[in-house]
Regions:
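Surface-exposed interaction regions that form or flank ligand-binding interfaces
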Residues: 1-60, 67-72, 78-88, 93-197
Length: 197
């Protein structure tokens, strides 16, 4: 485990409440990976600088990069209202709907294209590494103490699939163990350099 879950939020410009919620979501994701034994199987990097196509760091970071023996996962974590709710996407906005009443909960959230930019940038910058690794990008809607919401076929801009924590853990559990090959060492060094410090 490289970096610190939630560290990138300290300089994000979000208000204190949003920072605390975001940090809680990232810490809970790390705990879920630990509980499933995935931190021993896979290599994780927390609060990774995103790059633009000119190789410059941009403000938005990647919450977590996870590397298996065959896949690099770029993961964005969302800690929104949950429980007995359904998440729906419409015109770039994420709506939270109460399952029992069908009423909308709170204001819709604008769905950022950051992960689409991250996928494009990393595909471009690390094309040589991606001859040996697949690149997968996910937005994970984390459960709160009220439980997990249900996703109604939600995609973030750039067709980035949104999944529940359970779905993400299931995908990761089917991955090969990280291998400390030359390629694996290159990935570790590269993402280590991109950690927010």
């Amino acid at each position: 485990m490289f970096g610190e879950p939630g560290k990138g939020l300290n300089k994000s410009g979000f208000d204190e409440s949003a920072v605390n919620l975001g940090q809680e979501g990232e810490i809970n994701f790390a705990k879920a990976l630990q509980k499933k034994g995935l931190l021993e199987k896979l290599v994780t990097f927390w609060s990774v600088h995103n790059l633009n196509l000119e190789d410059e760091r941009v403000d938005a970071d990647i919450d977590c990069v996870i590397v298996s023996g065959s896949t690099i996962w770029l993961v964005d974590l969302k800690f929104y209202a949950s429980g007995n709710v359904i998440y729906r996407e419409e015109n770039g906005l994420l709506y939270t709907i109460d399952s029992a009443t069908g009423a909308q909960i709170g204001r819709p959230k604008k769905m950022s294209p950051n992960m689409s930019y991250a996928e494009e940038s990393f595909s471009h910058k690390f094309a040589n590494l991606l001859k040996y690794y697949r690149l997968e990008t996910r937005v994970v809607l984390m459960p709160t103490y009220k439980g997990a919401g249900r996703l109604d076929n939600v995609f973030w801009p750039g067709q980035i699939k949104a999944v529940s924590l359970e779905e993400m853990l299931d995908e990761l559990s089917r991955e090969d163990k990280f291998r400390d090959t030359i390629g694996g060492q290159m990935i570790r060094q590269t993402f280590n350099l991109l950690l927010k410090r």
